UniProtKB/Swiss-Prot annotation:
This is Sulfate adenylyltransferase subunit 1. Pfam families: GTP-eEF1A_C, GTP_EFTU. Heterodimer composed of CysD, the smaller subunit, and CysN. CDD domains: CysN_ATPS, CysN_NodQ_II, CysN_NoDQ_III. Belongs to the TRAFAC class translation factor GTPase superfamily. Classic translation factor GTPase family. CysN/NodQ subfamily. Residues 160-163 are annotated as: G4. It comes from Bacteroides fragilis (strain YCH46). Residues 84-88 are annotated as: G2.
Length: 476
């Protein structure tokens, strides 16, 4: 019985640890996979069978000479092991006494930019590796730009292979100075630089005696203590409705994930786009009712009043509204093998909201290697650009830098259902700045002589058409 209680106590304690999601990025052969493998090895997070397999594979496939090739722990695809590179995003989970970790080992090659965007979309922190011999190179700048694009607030510059430059403090300081000069305009608030040797384990889990001049923490100590709670947006309440729960006539609740902000019982809320107002009656979960909820909790909200709210709509505080608009600018990463057709209409999915959208213009493409801007007629795979959109119906959004959950979206090809692109919203665009006429069909209800008491019924009919792919806008 005591053993069962001990197990339960351990699981309860483990459940309460906070979670740090991090990605690694770097050029080919900078040692990303080796670093993560070393982190798992030195923190005693490998099972006996994994260690046996690692030793066998190191002799047969390894690229580390007589050393164990820790990269083989993460390079799982046959093509990766044969080429000695990372292609897919490899995820690894481990935990320490203080924190749980999910590591995304992302590919360094430019042709796999979309894989890195996918791996970094949920990350709190990025580890960017550089080879101490090579210093800051083109790929370092590219990966740092992508990290800033994704809104990742914490970056560790891991200067690897310090053993090959005799753990030179002067060389380390040169690299740090060059990197900080580049990163300053990108607006990343927290940059930490650590000298290490992934192969030998210096400054990975424990402080190294070979860098007496380095006064900072080892990599694992830093990862365990970096403060990430303030990265969440707890001020702007946004609750995209995912599902309306109606198990019986006596209960009607709105299910979803709290995207940002805090909601409490009794709070006044507004439903968008209708603008109708009510108060929160209860916050329901599987484990019982809560007095308040915050991101990323999934809850069911019940309201004091019977107001019409459905999937794709949003509950917010009336005194703190998101931007409600059909026109906006965004940074777009093209992820489809097929090049962009600027005349094509797409589905846009933002939070739980889905609408038809068109691309009005490409302001400029960003060269991820040089940061130069250029004018282009379309985008190809892995290219990034600043793009202007118009949607068929209004979206409820915040700029991505302010609110990741409500400032991000995907474009879906209506024919193939492929995810064509991912986007990060910059801000709304005023209609006077739009250079293309609005060609979505419009129902102007006052002009048609329709009485206001019939508006709600017409809105429901139009919503039903929208779910079938027919977009019609209503003006009241």
């Amino acid at each position: 019985m005591a053993d069962k209680l001990d197990i339960k106590a351990f699981l309860d304690k483990d459940e309460q640890k906070d979670l740090l999601r991090l990605l690694t990025a770097g050029s080919v052969d900078d040692g990303k996979s080796t670093l993560i493998g070393r982190l798992l090895f030195d923190s005693k997070k490998l099972y006996e069978d994994q260690l046996d397999a690692l030793e066998r594979d190191s002799k047969r496939l390894g690229n580390a000479g007589e050393h164990i090739d820790y990269a083989l722990l993460l390079d799982g695809l046959k093509a990766e092991r044969e080429q000695g590179i990372t292609i897919d995003v490899a995820y690894r989970y481990f935990s320490t006494n203080n924190r749980k970790f999910i590591i995304a080992d992302t590919p360094g090659h430019e042709q796999y930019t979309r894989n890195m965007i996918t791996g970094g979309s949920t990350a709190n922190l990025a580890i960017i590796l550089v080879d101490a011999r090579m210093g800051v190179i083109t790929q370092t700048r590219r990966h740092t730009f992508l990290v800033s694009l994704l809104g990742i607030k914490h970056v560790v510059l891991a200067v690897n292979k310090m053993d090959l430059v005799d753990f030179s403090e002067e060389r380390f300081n040169e690299i740090v100075a060059e990197y900080k000069k580049f990163v300053a305009p990108l607006g990343i608030p927290d940059v930490t630089c650590i000298p290490l040797s992934a192969l030998d384990g210096d400054n990975v889990v424990d402080k190294s005696e070979r860098t007496p001049w380095y006064e900072g923490l080892s990599l694992l100590d830093f990862l365990e203590t970096v403060h990430i709670d303030s990265d969440n947006n707890f001020s702007d309440f946004r609750f995209p409705v995912q599902y309306v729960l109606r198990p019986n006539l006596d209960f009607r609740g709105f299910c979803g994930k709290v995207a940002s902000g805090i909601i409490r019982k009794g709070d006044k809320v507004m439903a968008l786009p209708s603008g109708k107002v009510s108060h929160v009656k209860s916050i329901v979960t599987f484990d019982g009712e809560l007095d308040y909820a915050f991101p990323p909790q999934s809850v069911t909200l019940t309201l004091e009043d019977e107001i019409d709210v459905s999937r794709g709509e949003m509950l917010v505080h009336p005194d703190n509204l998101p931007i409600v608009d059909r026109n906006f600018e965004a940074m777009l990463v093209w992820m489809d093998e097929e090049p962009m057709d600027i005349n094509k209409s797409f589905f846009i999915k933002q939070t739980t909201n889905v609408s038809r959208t068109r691309i009005d213009s490409i302001k400029y493409k960003v060269d991820v290697n040089t940061m130069e801007h250029s004018s282009v007629p379309f985008l190809s795979l892995n290219e990034i650009a600043r793009v202007v959109f118009t949607t068929a119906k209004e979206l409820f959004f915040d700029p991505y830098r302010k609110n990741k959950s409500c400032g991000s979206f995907i474009l879906i090809d209506p024919i193939t259902n492929n995810t064509s692109a991912v986007g990060m919203i910059i801000d709304r665009v005023e209609k006077k700045d739009m250079n293309i006429a609005d060609d979505f069909p419009v129902l102007n209800l006052p002009e048609l002589g329709i009485a206001p008491e019939h508006y709600e019924a017409i809105e429901k009919a139009v919503k039903s058409l929208s779910e079938q792919g027919f977009e019609v806008r209503i003006e009241k």
